[in-house]
Amino acid sequence: MAKMSTTHEEIALAGPDGIPAVDLRDLIDAQLYMPFPFERNPHASEAAAGVDHWLSTWGLTDDPAVAAMISCTRPAELAAFNGPDMDSGLLQIAANQIAYQFVFDDRAEDIGRHSPGRLLPMLSESVAILRDGQPPTTPLGAALADLHRQVQERCTPAQAARWAWNSREYVHGLLYEAVAQAHPAPVESGLCRSIRSLIAGVEPFYPLCEAAQRCELAPEELHHPAMRRLSRLSADAAVWIPDLFSAVKEQRAGGMINLALAYRRTHRCSLPAAVTLAVRHINSTIREFEDLYGEVRPELSPSGIGYVEGMAGWIRGCYFWSRTVPRYADTLTAPAGL
């Protein structure tokens, strides 16, 4: 891999037309490679209402702070951008899951910030539900059990099993994040990327992308090395893009597991320069995804093509959602200058 320069002279903080970026969002828009055009599911508004009802049913928005977070995060909008072709039922499951993961992630961050061990009851309950079908003991666990039920009713047994496996990996990743946050020494960029991959929470949605197809993928297609590589590339790109837009918020909160902030620590540069370096890394990832997909597409089944298009949808959707979601509004207040 070519060495990335971090000198002020070699990092251009302007768009291709040479017009200087005003704020970080301008900078990201100007430099990020996004080959996938904007799309939106027509059932977005119904999904948003469904999310509100589902969260209320399980008592997750009884806390005003959680209700405010959901309002600023717009989980149904993210689902609609990621899955523009999903039917209304599958879109609702995806939207519920996104909302759940935001609640779960924020709760885990609050609990484990200073003492990772305090996360163990919460994470153990989730693993017991996902792995063993154990009954929940908390409102958050009850919501997860219901989400698991929704997936089992809509997906094939194999798809539901993959969903549960990927979801357990996400749960385990949150403990890694808590340990990294509590560690006195900064996390180096390679380890940061590894932890970020674990807590991305994107791959649990890929079985839903498969469920949106006319039939299951054959095992040899689903587990082909190229398909596994496409899954990794798309999940990483999809979660790193929001890292660009959340960098200001995470920096103020003392966050460690963020791609842009990892570059800033490693290269001791300004946040705009770090964002530019992170964009370069993301661009190379998206291009590798695009090139590999182009190579294998002629060999894929129609369901395989739809499955990979679902992965691409996460790259596209996370970008267009991150640009305007109130959760990352700080991006508009941060100057793009070095």
UniProtKB/Swiss-Prot annotation:
Pathway(s): Secondary metabolite biosynthesis; terpenoid biosynthesis
Enzyme Commission identifier(s): 4.2.3.162
Entry binding sites for Mg(2+) 1: D105, E109
Cofactor notes: Binds 3 Mg(2+) ions per subunit.
Positions that bind Mg(2+) 2: E109
Ligase is among the record's keywords: no
Record: residues binding Mg(2+) 3: S246, E250
Cofactor names: Mg(2+)
GO molecular function: lyase activity; metal ion binding
Site (Plays a critical role in the stabilization of intermediate cation): F102
Site-annotated residues for Plays a critical role for substrate recognition: D106, E177
Motif (DDXXE motif): 105-109
Function: Catalyzes the conversion of (2E,6E)-farnesyl diphosphate (FPP) to yield the bicyclic sesquiterpene (1R,6S,7S)-(-)-alpha-amorphene via a probable 1,6-cyclization, which could involve the abstraction of the pyrophosphate from FPP to yield a (R)-bisabolyl cation. The only accepted substrate is (2E,6E)-farnesyl diphosphate (FPP).
Official protein name in the record: (-)-alpha-amorphene synthase ((2E,6E)-farnesyl diphosphate cyclizing)
